Amino acid sequence: MSLCGIDEAGRGPIAGSLVMAGVILNTEIAGLNDSKVLSEKKRESLFPIILENSRYHIVSFTAHQIDEMGISKCLAAGLESIMQHIDSEDFLFDGNSTFGVRGLRTMIKADAKIPEVSAASVLAKVTRDREMVELAKKFPEYGFEGHKGYGTKTHVDAIKKHGYCEIHRKSFKLKALEPTLF
């Protein structure tokens, strides 16, 4: 039975979705690595190659779902969804927690070591980044196309000026936005 590599993108941002992908590669793909160390151009070039040469499942949780369920429950639900949609007996998730889901292994830095997890990393990141670029058109004042929803100074300044929008994770508290006594 083939290995299904699983990774996520968007666990830490203060806006946008959490995207998870599971991948079984049908063939070896050159150039795979942790999506965070690949250039955007390289990730975009690998994306269709991975889609054409794998069995995969991508699942996404909106900011509203993250606020309602919590990030850990979203991760668990994503893992379960991938395991239900991909036929494998060997599931490997990047990181050190199964989030209570049985039947999978974890490995720290698997996205840099295991091609199937690297491929999942690329699918998740490209899917999420494309979503943030589209959302930037709807909410241009936040600059999502640049920071992709992470808590950069530019993003925090935009929140201070415009307030939160519907894709912000209200459950993620930012010290920079908390009122101060002095």
Model-derived regions, located:
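RNase H-like, Mg2+-dependent phosphodiesterase core
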Residues: 1-182
